[in-house]
Amino acid sequence: DKSDVSANMDETKYKATPNQYVGENTTVEEVITNPAFGDFGRLLFPVDRTVSEDMTLSEVSTSSVYVWYNYIQVDKTVEIINSLIDDANSGNQIFYNVYSEEEMQTDSSKRDTGLFFFKGEENAPFAIMNAGGGFMYVGAMHDSFPHALEASKMGYNAFALIYRPDDPYADLAKAIEFIYDNADELQINSNEYSLWGGSAGARMAATLGNSDNLAQFTGRTDIPQASAVIMQYTG
């Protein structure tokens, strides 16, 4: 139901103040309880991995949390989080549920999904970044947030998808549907978009970047095929 999905557009804007910026010694708990992140702060970190709220950003930015990844830079983690706080301070909505409240009540696992929005220029094309994690977890902080941030700096409207490792293709299809149906409110160009991904995310991008698969997963033929698919790497 588009009306249910569109209700997400009217959520309260989450704001923070400059003294709530984070640093490498900020704890996970302090991040997820920051007013900028409302009730979705936990999704900044992998919900399918054990991440203690007592860990600092320096401690969490390691391959012990983000398994299979190396060269994780806490400075980039800090930059990403503070950039989102800045966007919230500016009155921008930085997170969207892609499923309706009714859908999430029916299937609580859908609460572990959503789109972090790194806003670019008005009516510019959009991109959806899909992190890897071996279909075991979503390594967004290291494998999709940095790409979304840099794309937004270039003017593109970038979304980083938090998906369920057990149902990734359905979640990406729902995300594409949500963005397409709410393009006017999001102030984006819905006719030109790209799908990005690394590892598991690359497979997601390649699958949903195919028009037949897109129609199969969405049940619709009105949504255009992605203009580009960027498969960074996959195993």
Labelled PLM ranges:
Residues 126, 152-162:
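A fold-wide structural signal in alpha/beta-hydrolase
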Residues 174-235:
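Primarily recognizes the serine-hydrolase "nucleophile elbow" in alpha/beta-hydrolase
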Residues 107-119, 125-126:
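A short loop-to-beta-strand scaffold at the N-terminal edge of the catalytic core in hydrolase folds
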Residues 114-120, 220-225:
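Short amphipathic alpha-helices and their capping/turn segments at secondary-structure boundaries
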Residues 133, 162-164, 235:
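Short beta-to-alpha linker loops that shape the active-site pocket of alpha/beta-hydrolase fold enzymes
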Residues 124-133:
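Short beta-strand element of the alpha/beta-hydrolase
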Residues 1-111:
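N-terminal targeting or regulatory segments adjacent to alpha/beta-hydrolase or S9 domains
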Residues 139-143, 159-190:
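Catalytic nucleophile-loop/oxyanion-hole region of alpha/beta-hydrolase
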